[in-house]
Amino acid sequence: MRHYEIVFMVHPDQSEQVPGMIERYTGSVKEAGGQVHRLEDWGRRQLAYPINKLHKAHYVLMNVEVPQQVIDELETTFRYNDAVLRSLVIHTKHAVTEASPMKAAKEERKPLAEVENNDFEDAEE
């Protein structure tokens, strides 16, 4: 089996359906005997340029190890699902399990926001 990195962008109005989509896609990977090494839901983010007159999309990143047939099925599913705006599937040489730069940057900002919030509360007193 080969390793793949999959990123897909979902229409922002369909954000509530993303957990179901993720469950469906990971289910098809596991059903074929594959493995999900990394799964990150980046949430709604600003697009670099408008796609179908939209300025935001819901991003999902998956690193999986599956046979080629499953990748073909996923790509077909992405192509015919109107909620998926864009998708990208890349073959990788090995399993990637560490946090992506997007996830790492988000986790770095989180403690800073908590510190700023605490400073604001102290200033009010």
From Swiss-Prot:
One of its GO terms (biological process) is translation. Keywords: Ribonucleoprotein, Ribosomal protein, RNA-binding, rRNA-binding. Belongs to the bacterial ribosomal protein bS6 family. One of its GO terms (molecular function) is structural constituent of ribosome. Residues 116-125 have a biased composition (Acidic residues). SUPFAM superfamilies: Ribosomal protein S6. Gene3D superfamilies: 3.30.70.60. The gene is rpsF. Residues 104-113 have a biased composition (Basic and acidic residues). Residues 97-125 are annotated as: Disordered. HAMAP family: Ribosomal_bS6. It comes from the Bacteria. One of its GO terms (cellular component) is cytosolic small ribosomal subunit. Binds together with bS18 to 16S ribosomal RNA. InterPro entries: Ribosomal_bS6 (IPR000529), Ribosomal_bS6_CS (IPR020815), Ribosomal_bS6_sf (IPR035980), Ribosomal_S6_plastid/chlpt (IPR020814), Transl_elong_EF1B/ribsomal_bS6 (IPR014717). This is Small ribosomal subunit protein bS6.
